[in-house]
């Protein structure tokens, strides 16, 4: 199992040379560190939202909005939480999954893909799914990379909404692993004083 995870995640911090046409490199300051990944073609980044020690920035398919979307890729960060050195990224990923489960306890599914390292920072990948959630009772599945940073917890997530399903959704592991590959390389880097976009120190 451990060997399989190494193979599955060996390219998460690899070169961007094989990035698909139309994709773009995203590197953005988030709560004291730079977070980077490849944004697949067809998505458009929106303005960041910050509130105290929380950060969020979403990207939607062209023509979609925060109120009406079928797919969303997002970066989030949370600071001033208990970043205990003894607690792994898997611990925080489990907390995220538990929060999602409360939204759809009867139709919740989860598929852990396992631990990895992003620039020597502890990270964990998991897929969660709700068969029915929200006022319109749509189905929603999300793949979340949780990174335990120096003083904050970060996530990069790809979520998809589909028509409601009364049962627990069967998670298509192959589909989501392919999407994960579309987002490499993931990066987490220190902020360099005075450095401006495109943040060459984090390439």
Go through the PLM ranges and name each one.
Residues 22-25, 55-57, 119-128:
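Short, hydrophobic/aromatic-rich segments at coil-to-beta transitions
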Residues 99-145:
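Signature of long, low-cysteine stretches enriched in small and polar/charged residues
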Residues 138-155, 159:
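A short, surface-exposed beta-strand/turn
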Residues 153-203:
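Surface-exposed amphipathic alpha-helical segments
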Residues 19-56, 201:
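N-terminal "mature-domain start" segment
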Residues 2-14:
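Bacterial N-terminal signal peptides
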